[in-house]
Amino acid sequence: KLRAQPAANDPGTDKTIKYSKIQSIIQKINSFTHENSLLANCRAVVELIDDLYRKLYSWFLHVLTFEDIQFPGDTFLDRLLKMDYCFTYYPSSNRHLIDLFEKTLDNQTFTNLDKFFDTSGNSPELLYQKTFSLKIFSKNLTAQDNGLYIYPLLKTDLSILDFLGTENILFHRGLIYHILHQKTIPQERENDLNKINQFFATVIQQVIETKSSCLPASLSQLLDTIFHFNRIGLNMETCRTYIEILSNHMATPDTQPIINTFTINLTHIVFTAHVFFICMENFSPTFIFYNRKKLILEQQRAILIIERNDYSTLWKQISDHIDCLFNVSLSESFFKEYTKGGNEDQKQFLYKNLFEKWGNVFFPFTYSVSTSNNSTAHHITTLELRDICKEVYQSDSPDAYESLLPYSTHPSFKTLYVKIYVIPMVSHITNLTFDKLQSDCRLLTLIHACKLLLPSQHLLLHYMAWLYAFSINVDHIDLGTFTVIKSVIFKIADHINVMTHTIYSPETNLLVSILLNAYTNYLQKYVNPWIKQTITANFSLIQTYITFTKQCASILATKCNINLDNLFIYITIGTDKIVTTSFCSFIATCRNLVRQHEEFEKSLQTIQISETTLTGMLRNIITSVSSSKELLTNEALQKFIDTVQRISQHVNETYQSISMNLEKCKTSNDILIESLKKIIYIVDVLSSNAILNTSLASRCLEAANLAVSNNSFTILEIKKDAVAVFKPFITQLFESMKPTTSLHKKLMSTQKLTTDHIPFLDTFDDRYNLVRHVERQLNWYAAHAEAAQQDLITPLKF
């Protein structure tokens, strides 16, 4: 909690002084709000209070420092991550971290930083901490990656948990990405993930769980919640990053339950924090925020549900919690105090004014209307009144409804007026498209008519006025807006049904046009950019993989012969010589092809992920649209659903075709890669590393077994015209692997030897080229291959 003020005899630390100042400011704001509570419906005062609270939120974020979120048990890496977090998102209050960050790195003597970093790859998860990695290597908290440097990146696998506190895991976005994209967790790391899940459960229970009594949170409690979220690495920006990561993640049936638990808990925490920060950014104890909150919740619900329809239950928990935290309303006791001394007409006006501004009825208001007894109204028949109402509706005059005022006290007037005038007008309005509604004046005419003739129907008038205000003020339609408008229109219909004791359903054209407009905006803002980015990335990946497959297929068509005199490889297709390369270059090429094959196996999984994500988006759109059952009879909506279904079917067919062709490529490539792995193993059996890691004797014995083993192979029959097709790929492949530094330059290098031991020299190095006619050399041993093998191996056998 935010600390209370220190005792009078306690000078206090910098922290306690800061917290006491925050508490003092909060108390002043609470006092100001309470003193002006009776003016809570005066727009001028409310706007000042609203602006004050929003400035307070901004100010509070700008006094947050690294020291506020530091735990006593933080590791060295924890402190570095938190310094980067505070300086990145709250730089104005954390300028002192520039020097502290550098000193922390300079003064560390017990931590080997090499353990933190990965030098083997460039996977998406590593890129989340790329700038942070540069900051560590440069010891500069202000460093920015401009693509000018190459440096190791912070590890993202579970081994980094050896250096990272469980409660600080959300400061490491790359690690979260890594865990989400795993199907199983190594057994030795399950305990670590269990601890993380327990920590998430604690956060949900202590920070997020809805209280038993849904009382609004105080300002101190709300600011304290901001503080707690920041202590675990969550703010508005990081929540958006995690939502993006989660939206691109799709669990599979074979995912380990412990990972599913992790995903569910993370989703609950991140989405709750995200909605909390949006509400907090707009919060004030006023009707302005009350109306904002309804729209915020509808917008976020629409976005969350369309991403994943299975989040419906989760959203109920999130919205209940947010409603509880930000429970701003009016009480009847406040209204009585507010209207003390006013007459009945004044109270009626103030009640109506409260209702119009808050958009809700928190308590009923009963009053009597005194009207002069109009003999004309009571002496006409119901049939005559029906004809009068019909004539007024059919009139071209916009003020024709005023002629009905003398009949408004007739016992049957309300029912007849609603049936003959209001219902046709509402049907006309809801049958318009949204564009036409903005230029049509009938809704405004209907509002004036009902205000004159049905003054006691506050809710009906409010919803009509809300619909009109929306039609003239909205500049952007989204799914949250559609949900609110749909609710308003059907509430108008419900009030009509109550007044007429009938079942009335509005037309669907207006809602469908708004819905299609909202989905069009959604597709343009979220789906289209994602598709464009994904297609570009996938297309580039597939093109590269096709080139790789062509190289593999070209090598499959070749025959390689080794010249033992100079260790050169002659590569041929049939009788045509294609290329000549050194043995070292040949082996390096083999290793490179095997490495590329393994990298492609990982990177091609992104295509499967993108398929799952895109089809999920389209499926959720269809499900979400179809959930509006009242609109399904609309022809335009049916066409939209059919279009999305056709797109979804086309996407499935396209991805299936891609998957089939990629599988064929993989099958072809696997044949070559298995052969290359055997070649590499034969070469590596006597390599420096193999001898160093085992022993010379064991390696020689293994080499002897390989020498006598029978490795048969089949030469493919290649058509003559295929040579021209394969040759460019083979030539390009081996040309790129030619060494750029000569052996002489390597030997003459002035660089000092930095290894701790004398290395076993590579037996295939150029310095070990076989000497021709070795038997002519003085004192050299010369024998046939079989005899030499026996002489070498016999002493090693035991």
Curated annotation (Swiss-Prot):
Its main location: virion. Belongs to the herpesviridae HHV-1 UL37 family. InterPro entries: Herpes_U30. The keyword Amino-acid biosynthesis does not apply. One of its GO terms (biological process) is virion assembly. It comes from Human herpesvirus 6A (strain GS). This is Capsid assembly protein UL37 homolog. It is found in: Virion tegument. Transmembrane segments: none annotated.
